[in-house]
Amino acid sequence: MNSKYEINTKENREFLKASCENLLNFGHRFPSPNGGSYYLGDDGTPWKDRNRETWITCRMAHVYSLGLMLGHEGSGELVDAALKGLRGELHDDKNGGWYAGVTQEGGIVPNKQCYAHAFVILAASSALTAGRPGAKELLEEAVDVYDQHFWNEEEGLACDTWNTEFTVLDDYRGLNANMHTVEAFLAAGDVTGDKKYHIRAGRIIDHVIRWAEDNSWRIPEHFTKEWVADLDCNRDRPDDPFKPYGATPGHGIEWARLITQWALANCREV
């Protein structure tokens, strides 16, 4: 085996460091003038004819918060640009929370997604860990909105999608948003020291492990509002980007990582 692929060899550490730097260099041109993230082409060129989405902007805030802590040049300014977008064009000043995104002309992409709001918590948590101005206030608002509209304390799970005004809740329930909620709650618990976030993450994980066990260890992705697995969801549209038909192997890998992270943080066996 090539030594650069052998864990913790000198060549492996150098390879990982170089790969990390290449990825961080690639994304430097993501911010639009108002802070929302552009999609990027293969060479890092901004695609200005596409929507600027909240979840991508949050991911960029998270990534460059890590970059800042790794000493990557320019990361602080990029985090601040993404936070500007989350406080500005992506924020719904009238109804609260965050739009799914904005169009290239600045119009609103409708609906309020748990998926996007979980990412706002992650972005703010990471930015706060990295010491960026305004991150604490953003995190406080993000968890307040999330608690009010998405988290169900009785169920120990999060709902999925509201209309833009937060007046009509869709019947669909899904694990993709809950997976990223676990990611966000782990980050929020780490930076605030509030144990309730790790407890909530553990409650979601308990559900997921049980559902996986009941389904031959293939994790169901889609559910009814009563949290009954809907194994036929999108059978006719198997390539839906956010609600694909069937189990998603990559999500199984991500759940394994999140469950391990939660267990290590809480000194638990699973």
What is each PLM-predicted segment?
Residues 1-270:
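Glycan-recognition and catalytic cores of secretory/periplasmic carbohydrate-active enzymes
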